[in-house]
Amino acid sequence: KTQIADKKHVVDAEGRVLRDNVWGPQIEDAARRDFTINAMYFDPVTQTVVDYHGGLADARGRVLRMIGDPATRYREDPVRILRVVRFAAKLGFGLDKATEAPVRGMVPLLANVPISRLFDEMIKLLQTGHALASLEQMKRFGLVGGGTPIFPVLEAALGGGSAARETFVRLALEDTDRRVAEGRAVAPSFLLACLLWHDVQDRWTAIKAQGEAPFPALQQAVDAVFDARIGDISGRGKLAADMREIWLMQPRFERRTPSGAAGLAAQPRFRAGYDFLRLRADAGEASSALADWWEDYHLGNDEEREALLADVKPASGPQRVKRAAPVASAAPADDGDADEGAETDDDTPPAGEGE
């Protein structure tokens, strides 16, 4: 490629590159790469590696080294800090002293990066198959719990020093790493639903304490958490809808009635909701027996489902409300028929809730 003279290299007052469409020969391209291990080229004619910055030696030594002056490079693009974290976690490489030294002091520069870009980078960090290692690196460099709220989702997930939160998040990230290792897809909506679940629970409890009914309270809690932690990002509508479904299914799993169970199992995102329930059971905040029951119900045939429902003990409190038969009726019904079809299942949420 040849250099285009009318394109400019533009930076802001803090040194962040705003526009950079100037390019040149291969040696200049190599100098613009982030790390030495990313600045190697293979020549298919001579079957040799062209290495301008000692990347091969660093790869063999398992060292992550920034090309150029690290502080300047971080100022040019603060997202390079997140790439340091991602590469170190994914490859298991150590950082050379010059690359590592400025990182903590540069973290506040990430506050100038658009929210949508930070969100995308966070998802990348957690979907490499090394989410737990990435989280440890983020803690190490002050990206989480360091006083600068770069990732509100992670701050909420780990906030308050709650052992229950940390256990649930750790299990969720372990599950994410396992899925990636098995070559299975990891939906961002499921991962985010896990990270923000306890935040939703806290707000749900607070809203119910104000006298709101459970399902409307949960919907309000979901909206509040999403606005506070996710914000205005691309694909917000689909992401919010998927997360909402997963969360709203959780209280419905507790109510196992014939119509309610069949309707829930038929939901398109039932499996995601069930996987979330299983994760909660593994963390000790939901019943393992309940998770087992739903697994059996989901996989069972009609007869097996009927048997499972028959084994369910009635929950405490009012379960069914029977309406009185109409005063004017054409003829008396046989015993047991008057209320046929007139029962309402108190466990079924109002229309539009959780569906």
What label would you give each PLM region?
Residues 1-355:
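Catalytic cores of the polymerase beta-like nucleotidyltransferase superfamily
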